[in-house]
Structures are given as structure tokens and as C-alpha cells.
Regions:
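ATP-dependent adenylate-handling ligase core
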Residues: 207-215
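Short, proline-centered helix/strand-breaking motifs
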Residues: 90, 205-208
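Enzyme catalytic cores with a strong preference for nitrogen-chemistry domains
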Residues: 1-177, 188-199, 212
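Conserved G/P- and acidic residue-centered "switch" motifs that form tight phosphate/ATP-binding loops
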Residues: 181
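Catalytic nucleophile loop
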Residues: 184
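Short beta-strand "acidic-cap" motif of Rossmann-like dinucleotide-binding folds
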Residues: 202
Length: 215
């Protein structure tokens, strides 16, 4: 129903929104539940979810590829919690994990109950299957993974981005120039975590300011 077309998004180059195509919301029957299906931007606006509820949706499922930035997981859970609470419906949010060129997706799929509380969560930056059970009255049951610390989350994003960029492009590894400074040392540490030490080679490229200890 809604198409993002800003920043890294260019959806209108490839798609026409369901609204423009004259298509209504998608509500399907799954194991005795009427489930409203939202895609990406749909979940951030009121109308798509309200339209699904008007067709009898008892729960919402959101499929999404939402680019990572610091604090995004918390923003996402808060926004979807507000959506679920305003409608009185449980919501399950299935999210992409991995890197695609310069964009990184952090996973951490989750479910909130009809009161907007997080009731299930998958791990960040990990390929996982999150199993949730929808119960009468809008309750949700499932495992809740603990979120990463801010520092660990940033590190995981950097490692994920490098690993998938190298792997998806079919590169055999990486060669890194070291100056002796902390910046290139940090790049080396990220590369080793992402690819393994056997796939990383270094070349010392000192400057007049490189200290002897760097050797």
C-alpha cells in the first residue's frame, strides 16, 4: 500500500503501490486466524493496518527489510508496539538479516502482543527461525533474545557488512594496508572477525609519522 522512495529506497522505479493499482489490503486465513499482511513501509502508516483490520484481521504480519542504524531496533519495536496497541492486535515482524552492498540489515525479528509489549525476539545479526504462538485475547508466546549492547551492535553491523560484501561478490579475501595507526588496525580487526585470519593479508605502508612500535 505504501512505497518508500527516499534515502536508500527507490521502490517506485520497480513497483506500483497496491493503492495505485486498485488493490485492497491482503488478509488471509492461517490456522484459524485472519492475518493481515503488511510489507515494509505499510507498517509505518495508519491506513494499511486499519484497512486490514476492517477486513477482519485478528493479527498482523509485517515482512520487512529495514536498514540498520544505531538505535534502529529500539525505534522499530517502539513503533510497532504503538501500532499493535492502537489496534488491539498482536503483530509479528519478520526482518531481513545480512548485508547488501552498503546497506546492512540487523535481523532481530520480533513479535508484540496486543498491548504493544515485546513478547518474542530473535537475535540481532544472526540467521534464526523465531517461533511464536498467538493466543486468544492478543497474547503472544515466544523466546526473547537479549539485545546487544550499543558497542556490540555497531561491531556486529560492521562485521556483517564486510562479510556479506566480500562473500556475495565472490572475492577470495581482502588485502589491507596498515599505517600503524588505530584506524587501519581497527579495519584489520573487523576484516579478521568477518572473514577469518586465513583470508586477510596485510601490507605495511608507513608514513613519516609511523612510530617504531608499529613495526
Amino acid at each position: 500500500r505504501e512505497l518508500p522512495n527516499y534515502q536508500v529506497f527507490d521502490e517506485r522505479r520497480y513497483f506500483v503501490s497496491g493503492r495505485e493499482a486498485g488493490l485492497g489490503p491482503v488478509v488471509v486465513d492461517v490456522l484459524g486466524w485472519r492475518v493481515g499482511l503488511l510489507v515494509c513501509e505499510d507498517a509505518w502508516f495508519d491506513e494499511p493496518a486499519l484497512a486490514a483490520q476492517s477486513l477482519g484481521a485478528q493479527a498482523l504480519v509485517v515482512i520487512n527489510a529495514s536498514p540498520f542504524h544505531a538505535g534502529k531496533r529500539g525505534e522499530r519495536e517502539a513503533r510497532m508496539g504503538d501500532r499493535a496497541r492502537s489496534l488491539g492486535l498482536p503483530l509479528v515482524y519478520a526482518h531481513l538479516t545480512g548485508g547488501q552492498d552498503e546497506v546492512v540489515f540487523d535481523g532481530a525479528s520480533f513479535a508484540v502482543d496486543a498491548h504493544g509489549a515485546v513478547a518474542a525476539r530473535a537475535a540481532s545479526f544472526a540467521d534464526e527461525t523465531l517461533q511464536v504462538t498467538l493466543l486468544p485475547g492478543g497474547a503472544v508466546q515466544g523466546a526473547v533474545a537479549q539485545p546487544l549492547s550499543d558497542e556490540a551492535e555497531i561491531w556486529a553491523a560492521l562485521v556483517c557488512g564486510v562479510r556479506d560484501y566480500v562473500g556475495k561478490n565472490g572475492f577470495p579475501g581482502a588485502i589491507i594496508g596498515l599505517s600503524g595507526g588505530i584506524d587501519s588496525a581497527l579495519v584489520l580487526a573487523i576484516a579478521v572477525d568477518a572473514l577469518g585470519a586465513d583470508k586477510v593479508r596485510t601490507v605495511m605502508m608507513p608514513s613519516p609519522y609511523t612510530a617504531d612500535i608499529s613495526w
